[in-house]
Amino acid sequence: MPDLLTAFALAAAVLTVSALASGIVERAPLSLPIVFLGLGFLIGEHGLGILALGAEDALLESVATLTLALVLYLEAVRMEAEEVRGAGLVPMLSLGPGTLIIVVVATVGAYLLLGTSVVESLLLGTILASTDPVVLRDVVRNERIPRSVRQALNIEAGTNDIVILPILLVLIAVANAEATSVAGWALFAVQVLLLGPAVGFAIGAGASWLMSRADDRWAISEVYQSLYGIGVVLLAFVCAQALGGDGFLAAFAAGFAVAILNFDLCQCILDYGETTSEMAMLLSFILFGVVISDLFAEAPLVPALLLALIVIFVARPLAIGIVLRKAAVSNAARAFIGWFGPRGLNSLLLALLVVGAGVPGAESLMAVTGVVVTVSIVVHGASATPLSSLYGRAIEGDTYPEEREGSAGGIFEGAANETVRIKPAQLAAVLEGGPPPLVLDVRNRSQYEKDKRRIPGAVRVRPDEVEEWARAWEDEHPRSQVQGQRIVAYCT
């Protein structure tokens, strides 16, 4: 266990290096996970020898547990119910069937290459099916990428652990022979798969209601509201674990309750949670870098590298190609979504769960996971900026179907019979006399760049971002103005 001075040094490294490196990382074929995993390798036993950690070290377990609980909670809170319902088929197919196909392909690869047992192969396949939102962050924030594609990647990365985690918990129970009868399995299912989410949802709902009422009555300081959000995560985790449920599923359920019940809570809760989560994730990358550098000696390197190639270049693209073959997206979008399914911190955290559960051979599985994750972080992190730019330029040069997802028609949802077309001459007359309408230039990227003509006073909104703009505009203006405002969407 590292001493207090070492712990402070690690915290200092996370805070200073992340801030200084962020500007360079945004412009270079790099990512912060590459930087911090590399820092872990550097200070580990096979580097400078500053820090030595084992897979079962208490510091690693504590940081990893907090990180995964926070990540799951925040992923759920960010899921706006309306946005997920209207997201379309693409993210749902990637999340469900796509994830299961990756599990199967990775499992077969592990079984053939590593000679692991069926259960061990399934554990490894499940661990390696987790998509990392940290490595994807630069991609999903790039506004040159159509919103529907970014949303597909974001929803999948943010929620596929909820598909994977129950599978992993069942496999851990099988590996440890925790249940041997029908009654035993029924009790396990209730405790882990139902009790945890139920406890988490109840705590998330109750805590949100309490803070909403307290803030309305006493105007709670944003500082304390920010801390309250972290407390809700920890409370949900602890209560679920104490009652025999799963704390991680409880953390997600607590966040989901906050999202769908839509209490009027301070944005600071999410902002501070994301800041805390970011620091915990980067610290986790350092610690895992230290551990992985030591475990590499135990991993069958060549088979592990071959498995990494299968997971990255075969399993993910194959799964996405199958599930999206009839989706309304271009081949470029299929290739883009198929490529950006990086394995990262989430896979390492899931592997650590297996180690902590005492599964036989778990450290070997974690060593292989470390090899695959290292390859993925380097390859996907290095390709994020150039491939995003390449796809963005392609979108600006042509009209792709995914750019029309979430298009201007959404702004008139619920009033389709009132939607009328207006000719340019009619629009000119309306603009000259009477209360002017709000004109939105919603042409696709390629047409907007090619045709430099502009309507005076028009607001530029990309076609895939109209619904998001409409929600924000309605929130910012009084209801009387919203109801009386005429809107004209200009497209080609």
Predicted features, each with a name:
Residues 1-402:
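Transmembrane helical cores of multi-pass secondary ion antiporters/exchangers
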Residues 76, 451, 455:
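Substrate-recognition/cap helix-loop segment adjacent to the acidic, metal-dependent catalytic center
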Residues 385, 389-452:
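Flexible, polar/low-complexity N-terminal or interdomain linker segments that lie immediately upstream
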Residues 461-462:
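Short acidic-hydrophobic, aromatic-tinged amphipathic segments that line or gate anion-handling sites
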Residues 465-469:
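A short acidic, often aromatic-flanked loop/helix-cap motif at beta-alpha or helix-coil junctions
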